[in-house]
């Protein structure tokens, strides 16, 4: 599943390519994703101009004139594909956004766990109302993290992945951030020291920023709208490295399951 860095890369690409473009048509080939695509999406968006594109958590948001917002989540396998001319549609091209200059954005999602909805301004605010803090903001710090987690009994990795606490830090970047901070994913979130909260907040920011700079992580499905792959996976310390030696100490990387998710860590470096 694309996480914060991948969605940030996608949103930045789209901001450059489709901001101030007018939507001429929306073609829906499959209305049933994890939730139905907004009824009458074509009528709602035809003639609207994209005024801004931003990210919230793992969602990309296209704000249009008329105070409408296109909310897109890529699910497990979704992609947004940028085309500069008419492009033959593929089996899993569920939604095509056509622009007046004949460019288009295609939402492709083989597993159909994605989301494409249109909301007004008030609905957009309510949709994201219970989301946690954005980890790349100035507010996100050791002090903030300590206050946020001081009473949380859950293990620290699960806490980092709780969207109501912190948005966008999925399985990959939680594992990598904890390794960089040298903190075991098994530790209760409330039991870290202040210095550990401070270190972890910094390493979450560093890991996410490094991944964005690398274009995200391409493991299976993810690609940028241009078709280019990300390459942050080449810099992984622990994720997907089970039974391989740790890059720091040569200890063998361990794989466990936490809340149904794979967790990779070095039990020598992380404590």
From Swiss-Prot:
Q: Which residue spans match zinc fingers labelled FPG-type?
A: 237-271
Tell me what reaction this enzyme catalyses.
Hydrolysis of DNA containing ring-opened 7-methylguanine residues, releasing 2,6-diamino-4-hydroxy-5-(N-methyl)formamidopyrimidine; 2'-deoxyribonucleotide-(2'-deoxyribose 5'-phosphate)-2'-deoxyribonucleotide-DNA = a 3'-end 2'-deoxyribonucleotide-(2,3-dehydro-2,3-deoxyribose 5'-phosphate)-DNA + a 5'-end 5'-phospho-2'-deoxyribonucleoside-DNA + H(+)
Per its UniProt record, what InterPro entries does this chain match? DNA_glyclase/AP_lyase_DNA-bd (IPR015886), DNA_glyclase_Znf_dom_DNA_BS (IPR015887), Formamido-pyr_DNA_Glyclase (IPR020629), FPG_cat (IPR012319), MutM-like_N-ter (IPR035937), Ribosomal_uS13-like_H2TH (IPR010979), Znf_DNA_glyclase/AP_lyase (IPR000214), Znf_FPG/IleRS (IPR010663)
Specify the superkingdom: Bacteria
Tagged with keyword Hydrolase:
yes
Cite a single GO BP annotation.
base-excision repair
UniProt cofactor(s): Zn(2+)
Q: Which SUPFAM superfamilies match?
A: Glucocorticoid receptor-like (DNA-binding domain), N-terminal domain of MutM-like DNA repair proteins, S13-like H2TH domain
Q: What does the entry comment about cofactor binding?
A: Binds 1 zinc ion per subunit.
Q: Which residues form the active site?
A: 2 (schiff-base intermediate with dna), 3 (proton donor), 58 (proton donor), 261 (proton donor)
Q: Where does DNA bind?
A: 92, 111, 152
What GO terms are given for molecular function?
8-oxo-7,8-dihydroguanine DNA N-glycosylase activity; class I DNA-(apurinic or apyrimidinic site) endonuclease activity; damaged DNA binding; zinc ion binding
Instruction: Report the EC code(s) recorded for this entry.
Output: 3.2.2.23, 4.2.99.18
Q: Which UniProt keywords apply?
A: DNA damage, DNA repair, DNA-binding, Glycosidase, Hydrolase, Lyase, Metal-binding, Multifunctional enzyme, Zinc, Zinc-finger
- Can you list the disulfide-bonded cysteine pairs? none
| PANTHER family, per database record | FORMAMIDOPYRIMIDINE-DNA GLYCOSYLASE
| Similarity-based family | Belongs to the FPG family.
The entry describes its oligomerization and partners as:
Monomer.
Spell out the HAMAP family in the cross-references.
Answer: Fapy_DNA_glycosyl (MF_00103)
Role: Involved in base excision repair of DNA damaged by oxidation or by mutagenic agents. Acts as a DNA glycosylase that recognizes and removes damaged bases. Has a preference for oxidized purines, such as 7,8-dihydro-8-oxoguanine (8-oxoG). Has AP (apurinic/apyrimidinic) lyase activity and introduces nicks in the DNA strand. Cleaves the DNA backbone by beta-delta elimination to generate a single-strand break at the site of the removed base with both 3'- and 5'-phosphates.
Name of the featured protein: Formamidopyrimidine-DNA glycosylase
């Amino acid at each position: 599943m694309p996480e914060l860095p991948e969605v940030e890369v996608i949103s930045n690409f789209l901001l450059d390519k489709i901001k101030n473009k007018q939507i001429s048509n929306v073609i829906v080939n499959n209305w049933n994703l994890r939730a139905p695509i907004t009824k009458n999406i074509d009528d709602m968006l035809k003639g609207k101009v994209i005024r801004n594109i931003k990210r919230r958590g793992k969602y990309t948001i296209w704000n249009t004139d008329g105070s409408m917002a296109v909310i897109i989540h890529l699910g497990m396998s979704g992609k947004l594909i940028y085309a500069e001319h008419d492009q033959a549609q593929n089996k899993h091209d569920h939604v095509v956004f056509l622009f007046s200059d004949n460019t288009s954005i295609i939402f492709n999602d083989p597993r159909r766990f994605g989301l494409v909805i249109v909301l007004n301004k008030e609905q957009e605010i309510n949709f994201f109302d219970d989301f946690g803090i954005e980890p790349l903001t100035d507010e996100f710090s050791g002090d903030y993290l300590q206050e946020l987690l001081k009473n949380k009994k859950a293990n620290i990795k699960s806490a980092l992945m709780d969207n109501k606490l912190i948005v966008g830090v999925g399985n990959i970047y939680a594992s990598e951030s904890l390794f960089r901070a040298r903190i075991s994913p098994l530790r209760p979130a409330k039991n870290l020291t202040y210095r550990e909260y401070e270190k972890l907040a910094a390493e979450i920011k560093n890991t996410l920023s490094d991944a964005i700079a690398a274009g995200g992580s391409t493991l299976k499905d993810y690609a940028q709208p241009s078709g280019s792959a990300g390459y942050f996976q080449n810099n992984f310390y622990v994720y997907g490295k089970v039974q391989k030696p740790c890059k720091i100490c040569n200890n063998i990387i361990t794989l466990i399951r936490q809340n149904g998710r794979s967790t990779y860590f070095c039990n020598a470096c992380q404590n």
